[in-house]
Amino acid sequence: MTEEGVEWLARRPRPAVSWKTQKQAALFGETPTQELLMPVEALRIRGRHNAMNALAALALIDAVGLPLGPALQVLKNYEGEAHRVQPVLSVNDIEFIDDSKGTNVGAVKAALEGLGKSGRRVSIILGGDGKGQDFSPLAQALADYADYAVLIGRDADKIEAGIAASGICLEKAGTDFEAAVQMAFDHAAKGGVVLLSPACASWDMFANYAERSARFVAKAKEIAASVSGKPEEVD
C-alpha cells in the first residue's frame, strides 16, 4: 500500500472484535485498517514482483503464528540471487541493476514489469545470442516501462525487428559492451534504472553470464567515479 507517497509492505490485522464478520463491519461503515510493516524501498531486492514475493513469505509466517519481526529483519538484509535484478550502485539518482541471468523474454518482461510498476523508468541493455526466440512479446512491456534500449551482439537486428512496435528509442552498440552501458546511462531518466537484462545468452561476446555481469559492474563503477568521484551506496 502507499501512504503519504511511500510504498509499504503492509498487512491487515486480525479483527479485535471476533464476532464482527466482514459483512457486519461493512454495515457499520467500517473499513479494514492496514498495519505498516516496512517501506518497500528498504528492501535490497528491487521490483514490485519481489515486493509481492516478500509479502507472500510474510503471509505464510503470519499464518502459522510466528512473529514477523525476525522475518522483516531477514528481508531487509536479503540481497537476492546474484545477477537476478541485483542492485549494483547508484549515481546521480540513477541505479544500475544487474539481471545478467535474464536470458529469455519471460525473465526480461518480469524485470521490466517489476521495476516499472514501482514507478521507475528503465534504460535497458538487450542482446546477444537470442537462441531462436521471438522477441515481439517484449514490445508492450518496453512501451509501458522503458524509455530507451541499446542493442548488442549477434541478434541485435532480430531484436530490433521484434520490439520496433514499442515505439521507444532503439540504438545499437555492436559488440562494444562498455559503450552500450555508457549509452544506457546517458539516456536514463532521473530516478530510473540502467538495467542489464539481455534476454539472450552471452556466448557470442562473453565466456558466460558472469563475465557479462562483471564487465557491467566495472563500467558502472567507472561511470560513477567519473561523474561523482565515488558511487552512492545502495541500501
Residue ranges and their predicted role:
Residues 1-40, 81-84, 88, 115:
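Extended acidic/charged loop-beta regions that coordinate divalent cations
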Residues 38-145:
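Nucleotide phosphate-binding/pyrophosphate-handling subdomain across enzymes
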Residues 13, 103, 128-131, 155, ...:
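Short glycine-rich anion-binding loops that position phosphate/pyrophosphate groups of nucleotides
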Residues 121-123, 195-199:
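Short beta-strands and strand-loop turn motifs
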Residues 2, 186, 204, 217-235:
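Phosphate-binding loop of NTP-binding sites
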Residues 59, 206-209:
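Short, solvent-exposed loop/turn segments at secondary-structure boundaries
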Residues 136-192, 231-235:
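C-terminal helical cap/extension that packs against the catalytic core
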